[in-house]
């Protein structure tokens, strides 16, 4: 398990764009499971949407990318580097994510060739699938 301070040693994101609070498990270069506690105090809820706060889908995808980046950047050859989005396929949003929800984010790397790779991510609230996507990334 990794706490927020350990996560910040691996990925460069910071408030308000650090979208993972804890890593529950990680297999370096293979997969990671993380948590995001969705608080009513998140800055994006001021405008998305007033009176009906919903976590933007793009931020759920970004949370997946950050969890996946932890797994990739723990590999010795990528220590101290950054992972960048290179593409996204088959993104689907199945359930709204609202204040008070806890997102469990599961990301599994499917392919890594040199510094470019592909991963599959899913985000759950409880046992309910909230979002899923295939993510492409490049490490620099």
Curated annotation (Swiss-Prot):
NCBIfam families: fabZ, PRK00006.1. This is 3-hydroxyacyl-[acyl-carrier-protein] dehydratase FabZ. The gene is fabZ. It holds the Pfam family FabA. Its main location: cytoplasm. It catalyses: a (3R)-hydroxyacyl-[ACP] = a (2E)-enoyl-[ACP] + H2O. It is found in: Cytoplasm. HAMAP family: FabZ.
